Amino acid sequence: MTLRETIISAPGIDASPDENQCPSNVPAYIVSREQFRDAARMMKTADARLVAEWATDESHYSSLPLPSGEREGVRGRGFGIYACYARDNEYLIVKTYTPIEDPTFPSITKKFAPAHRFERQMNSLMGVIPTGHPDLRPWIRHEDWPEDAYPLRKSFDASKPMQRVKGEYNFIKAEGEGVYEIPVGPVHAGIIEPGHFRFQAVGEDILNLEERLGYVHKGIEKRFESLSWTEGVKLAGRVSGDSTVAHSLCYCRALEAMTGCNPPERVLWLRALMLERERIANHLGDIGAIANDAAFAFLLYQFSRLREMLLRINLKLFGHRFMMDRIIPGGVIIDINSDGK
């Protein structure tokens, strides 16, 4: 039984197809807020995995008629709650809606462990509340953010600096004889990005490790709202410099799905070539870094040399070491012949 058949035939779940879903080969079904967790249970029973969970502010649609497939009472014209599931090569999106005056929805963390951080992030940035979540401490939002600051809400004004306040993050505490804490970060030696790690230990035995991230949250998602498509793809390509091809392609594929644009086959092959070269370069760098963490510095030097050779070939083929800005909505900006010219 497919995931689509599972959600349609699930007892006690009234799921209706979202006929406006893009891309059309990833079906989406709308359920009531009360049935959102039941749908997760059915996906778990079907051996599906949770790919992602996110929220959207759809309050600005309140004056528009309901789209096809969405029933009165199901869509509250407030926040959209989405969960994407996968099994093998099949994907399915389950969505529900929660009103602005009561932005709650049933947590699916107890069904799918990865939802734990997804839902904490949704709570931090959108202000929706996953009821039944075991840990609703702020994840992305830091203690100097005002209580009512939710950057991904449409009402949030990103044109001026956020007013800062005083606050304190409540780390998990371990108590007992001989228990001590080791704080690491958020500033580290080297060039890695910031992150705070709180170790609790007895002797050399680690009892608990808690990560505190989000120090480089830049408001990128909010920034996309004010950009044109051509500006947006440039921003996407700068989310992570060494993964610029992957991020640019994701942005372009989303636009192409919404507009029904089908790039030519040659464009698809050129994009695939750039993706593979980016993947190989990053794997070479990562393997070398892993070896270096185990004090095998010589292997790091060798893999770094191979990675540099690959990046120099990228420059010759595509005009940029990391192939930044080579992918645009609907196509690519560069072509190569069989001689690589």
Task: Describe each model-derived feature in a short phrase.
Residues 1-67, 76-205:
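Terminal low-complexity/charged segments
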Residues 69-71:
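A short, hydrophobic C-terminal helix/tail in secreted or cell-surface proteins
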Residues 87, 112-116, 125, 130-205, ...:
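Catalytic cofactor-binding cores of redox enzymes
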